[in-house]
Amino acid sequence: MDTVIELSKLLFKGNASCTSTPTLKTARIMESAVTGITLTTSIPMIIIVVTTMILYHRVAKHNATSFYVITLFASDFVLMWCVFFMTVNRKQLFSFNRFFCQLVYFIYHAVCSYSISMLAIIATIRYKTLHRRKKTESKTSSTGRNIGILLLASSMCAIPTALFVKTNGMKKTGKCVVYISSKKAYELFLAVKIVFSFIWGVLPTMVFSFFYVIFCKALHDVTEKKYKKTLFFIRILLLSFLLIQIPYIAILICEIAFLYMPQNTCFWLARVEILQLIIRLMPQVHCFSNPLVYAFTGGELRNRFTACFQSFFPKTLCSTQKRKDSDASEHDQNSKSKASVEKNQPL
């Protein structure tokens, strides 16, 4: 969603040509390409993963993090649809009213906060499960309560962001924009940016890294061979998360620094828009990497899909297996009889 800053009608006055530079046009084309790729790949992957995990829980017991991972993918699914609506509106393919713009922007920030925070919570739960040294299956009631509290907290954090959203009334296009028209609103907007930089960037990275590093060290100290697959999974998980989050934190800090010292120049406007463009892409990259890392790494999803298939189609599998066994036994008998006939033939 584009940001329109108009401080007492002075900032950006007469700078309409700044938004049509070749650099910004190229950046917007690249953003559209990346968004299209993530939308077309992430949504089908998330549907496959969530469906498989839900069906698997009907035939097998769940572990401590199962429901949390399912809600993580569900929030990623909602987030990608919010990205879709925001993209088609930004390209002016559809016009929205102010309420729908605020609703989409609110849901986007709420589920994004929930998704990134859930990654850190899953890390803490795995750490607790490891150190209790016993089977720790979370009760449905406590799991639901924790998910509800996190969802409520994420929604409360997202409320201030929706207050800045309006439709671009100057051009009458129905395009959703973050509109700031006073110095107090600008200061509040900057404060909200700082809070979300901490919620989306610093805090999850610290919690995630701390608990997974300890988790990895504990498994390595027990025996590396026994937990070789788990160690590989945790290392891939940690590496992929840090490769996204560390540049993300750096870009968030740069954006806050630029917004803290606004300038009425095309160069300043171009830098801020490019930073905001990259920031918009980072949650999409998380939504793309989460199914790949959490589900498709290590073959766990394949095993669960096979278990679901065997559970829902047992008769077919049994008859197929029996047919294979009978064919194999018949083949062995034919081989033995042929060998005996050849043995009894005269030379």
From Swiss-Prot:
It is found in: Membrane. Residues 322-341 have a biased composition (Basic and acidic residues). Disulfide bonds join C101-C176. The keyword Protease does not apply. Keywords: Disulfide bond, G-protein coupled receptor, Membrane, Receptor, Transducer, Transmembrane, Transmembrane helix. One of its GO terms (molecular function) is G protein-coupled receptor activity. It comes from the Viruses. Its main location: membrane. One of its GO terms (cellular component) is membrane. Pfam families: 7tm_1. Residues 321-347 are annotated as: Disordered. Probable G-protein coupled receptor. This is G-protein coupled receptor homolog U12. It comes from Human herpesvirus 6A (strain Uganda-1102) (HHV-6 variant A). The gene is U12.
